[in-house]
Amino acid sequence: MSAQPGATIPSAAEIAAIHSAGKIAAVRQAKRAPFFRGRLDHIDLTRLDDPAEWAKIPLLHKDMLRAMPDAEFYRNFCLPPSEDDRIAQYWRSGGTTGRPLFYPRSRRDIEVAMHGFARVYACAGAKPGQTVHCAYPLGIHPVGQMMTRAAEASGLGALMAGAGTTTPSSLQIELIDKLKPDVLTGMSSYALHLANLADQNGIDLAHGSVDLVICSAEPLSAAKREKLRRMWGAEVRDSFGMTEAGMMAAEDGVADGFRVWSDLFFLEVIDPTTGQLLPGGETGALVVTPLFTNNITPFLRWMSGDLVTLRRDVPGAGPFAVFPVLRHAQRTTGFFKIRGININHGEFEDLMFRMAQINDFKCEAVTADALDVLRVCVEIKRNADPAAAVALVEREIKRVFELTPRVETLEVGTLAREFEASVKAPRIVDRRA
């Protein structure tokens, strides 16, 4: 096995050995951070392969980190980089609170994480020598630049196009028609938007060069997958990761779910109420401990906010069959993800109800012109300026959630009548197909 984690696919026996050593190293790393002072003193490092001993480690929630001011987060949770392993990047957390978290990533973190991103291409079926059109948003969230660099590292030609803000969508269609890439990678909603735009311009992508579409960063429903397959005339594969850990998994087209890189991450599925470890195949809360991308951010038993199943020994073809299969069910709390941004329902309500001009509202995640859209319907307080109120809602949602909503006004009383017809007011709803 290679000295660098993730460079090769290990055997099942090697993965077990990686877990034994990696869990000890992860706890030792965490104990260096002031945040964990006094939280891990009762842990017996010689018994971490015993699930009961490992379960004594307290679960880590994002709210614990969000509660810290920036200076405290970097001082108490993050570890100082070593002389030979300086900070290489900062990754923005996928969640939003008005004060997003920015995780430092060291050079060694990035080297290992790059293998996780590169595996997506190999697992999904991309081959060296092919060309990839990379259409993820470009910025401090890592997926766009990391998937592009991973394509290059995998022997694939890469076009870093972005998701419409850096390279206009119309130009991207021209480039796809002209350069004839084999693979498109991007968020599913943007891939559909490109397909619709191509159709409007008389370009038949279904009979074009792209034969593989790789998605990530937002939910991929069965209906959306089928529409992508039909419009692009391509196989569609999804992938799964999180900023706290890195790219963690991808579909191989055989198993029903993601092959998850269990040599880079130690995964648990627990009962979200009792915290008890669940048997394989049962739905529970995903808990992640990065084993090698923790040189500055020592995430330990991280509650990701996802409900999943995890099955081991799932038959498959090729080297990735050694990995367990993770199937994503839903978020454990009130979230939905739009264009890679997690919208927390409670935080959204707090924001809306702080605006004096707004009487009531409902928020819906919808699909419009193949793009995921945040539609916000508002009832405006009498005597308030409707145009100014709409502008305020747009501005505040953009400021806090970094997402531009589609705001519509309703006659006062409309929502009350809707809510009265339901036992539980459907104020925030995901209506995407």
Where are the language model's segments positioned?
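Nucleotide 5′-phosphate-binding alpha/beta core
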Residues: 1-92, 98-115, 122-123, 178, ...
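Active-site phosphate/ATP/adenylate-binding loop shared across adenylate-forming ligases
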Residues: 4-6, 63-231, 237, 245, ...
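Helix N-cap/coil-helix junction residues
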Residues: 35, 45, 59, 126, ...
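Generic structural signal for residues in well-ordered beta-strands
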Residues: 158, 236, 267, 361-363, ...
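Extracytoplasmic/secreted proteins and extracellular or luminal domains
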Residues: 177, 203-206, 279, 300, ...
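Conserved AMP-binding/adenylate-forming
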Residues: 211, 215, 220-314
